[in-house]
From Swiss-Prot:
It comes from the Eukaryota. This is Long chronological lifespan protein 2. InterPro entries: LCL2. CDD domains: LCL2-like. Keywords: Signal. The keyword Signal applies. GO terms for biological process: ERAD pathway. Belongs to the LCL2 family.
Length: 123
């Protein structure tokens, strides 16, 4: 009787150990390891809160106008540069403001023409 009980207990112990190892494998493959990867990439990325931007904005020295998108110091708001000048064209509107629009692969001046058509309600 003791021999049967010991055999059953040993069998359950081996089964539990094998099951645990199997679940650890699946956890590592489908989720557990992902948390570690996310943790590593979060250490390399800029935080998603606005504290860094707010500190940089507050510490910027500008006697004229500080552009909120680029933190450039310019004389008037419509002189602010585009955030991504390689892929954006700046278009100054007649009311003293300016917008940056995607070049979108258009030829030179095409973005400005489309903005003007949109302002007239033709696009």
């Amino acid at each position: 009787m003791v021999h049967i009980f010991t055999s059953i207990l040993l069998g359950l112990l081996l089964l539990a150990t094998g099951t645990r190892a199997q679940f650890q494998f699946f956890e590592q493959m489908f989720g557990g390891g992902q948390q570690q990867q996310q943790h590593d990439s979060r250490e390399q990325n800029v935080p998603s809160d606005s504290d860094w931007y707010q500190r940089t904005y507050d510490n910027a020295r500008c006697s004229n106008y500080l552009c909120p998108g680029t933190l450039a110091c310019v004389a008037v708001p419509h002189h602010c540069p585009c955030q991504h000048p390689a892929v954006e064209d700046k278009f100054e509107l007649g009311d003293g403001s300016a917008i940056c629009v995607s070049k979108g692969g258009f030829k030179f001046g095409e973005a400005a023409r489309k903005v003007e058509l949109a302002r007239k309600g033709l696009l």
